[in-house]
């Protein structure tokens, strides 16, 4: 749904609920952030996709969502191309709770995931980890977030969310790549939205340990010189 405010800006309606439980997601602010986007653009790019809140809010007619972390992109790609499988991934793990304690299931899935990173395990972990904080050890890259105190949402609730998000993401392609590749692919008239790792999170996030804001700002400057629209969310207090 799109309501034009004036000739330059538009407003959008965010999804009703998050698909992934993800700390730092922009679900609450997606409508406000998108007000600053131009109403007319070609392809929408989001190179730090994360929770996908902005992409889903815009539900673009042409979009590219990317992230450096492959298991995350596996989730988004499955959402678009095989949503029923995504539900089965979640159901298979959630329904183990009852025969085993929530913590036992979580620890088991976490152990499997750390041995072989994959989207199916990562989906469950994002929805059940403590506070939605997806934390990785710098020493070995293992996810180290403990089990959360909350109960995971019911399978049918998750299924309804998948249906809505699948519809919103139907025109989006998902790729696992570095943000610099996305900038190199964008053309004049395209829009890039960047929500990079904040300074206080760079010690715990996947792919964030070597991130340099100065490099991103150089990419943004070059993109703008080519007639590409760029929007940036940044931790101004740091």
Task: Give the positions of each predicted feature.
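Short active-site oxyanion
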Residues: 40-44, 61-62, 169-173, 224-230
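A short acidic (Asp/Glu
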Residues: 56-58, 75, 185-186, 203-206
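The conserved SAM/SAH-binding core of class I Rossmann-like methyltransferase domains
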Residues: 66, 177, 233
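Beta-hairpin (beta-strand-turn-beta-strand) motif
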Residues: 68-69, 126-128, 235
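Amphipathic, non-transmembrane alpha-helical secondary structure
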Residues: 31, 56, 180-184, 217, ...
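SAM-dependent nucleic-acid methyltransferase catalytic core
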Residues: 2-29, 35-39, 82-193, 197-204
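Conserved S-adenosyl-L-methionine
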Residues: 36-97
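Conserved acidic-Pro-Pro-aromatic motif
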Residues: 188-238
């Amino acid at each position: 749904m799109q309501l034009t405010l004036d000739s330059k800006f538009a407003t959008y309606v965010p999804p009703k609920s998050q698909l992934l439980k993800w700390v730092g997601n922009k679900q609450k602010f997606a409508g406000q952030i998108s007000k600053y986007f131009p109403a007319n653009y070609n392809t929408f790019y989001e190179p730090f996709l994360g929770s996908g809140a902005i992409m889903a809010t815009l539900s673009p007619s042409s979009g590219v969502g990317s992230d450096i972390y492959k298991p995350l992109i596996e989730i988004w790609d499955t959402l678009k191309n095989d949503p029923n499988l995504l539900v089965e991934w979640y159901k298979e793990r959630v329904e183990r709770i009852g025969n085993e304690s929530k913590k036992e299931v979580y620890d088991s899935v976490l152990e499997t995931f750390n041995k072989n990173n994959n989207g199916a395990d990562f989906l469950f972990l994002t929805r059940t980890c403590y506070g939605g904080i997806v934390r990785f050890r710098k020493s070995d890259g293992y996810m180290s977030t403990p089990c959360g105190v909350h109960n995971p949402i019911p399978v049918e609730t998750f299924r309804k969310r998948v249906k809505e998000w699948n519809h919103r993401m139907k025109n989006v392609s998902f790729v696992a790549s570095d943000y610099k590749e996305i900038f190199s692919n964008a053309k004049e008239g395209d829009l890039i939205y960047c929500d990079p790792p904040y300074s206080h999170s760079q010690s715990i996030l996947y792919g964030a340990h070597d991130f340099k804001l100065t490099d991103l700002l150089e990419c943004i400057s070059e993109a703008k010189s080519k007639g590409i629209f760029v929007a940036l969310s940044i931790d101004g207090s740091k």
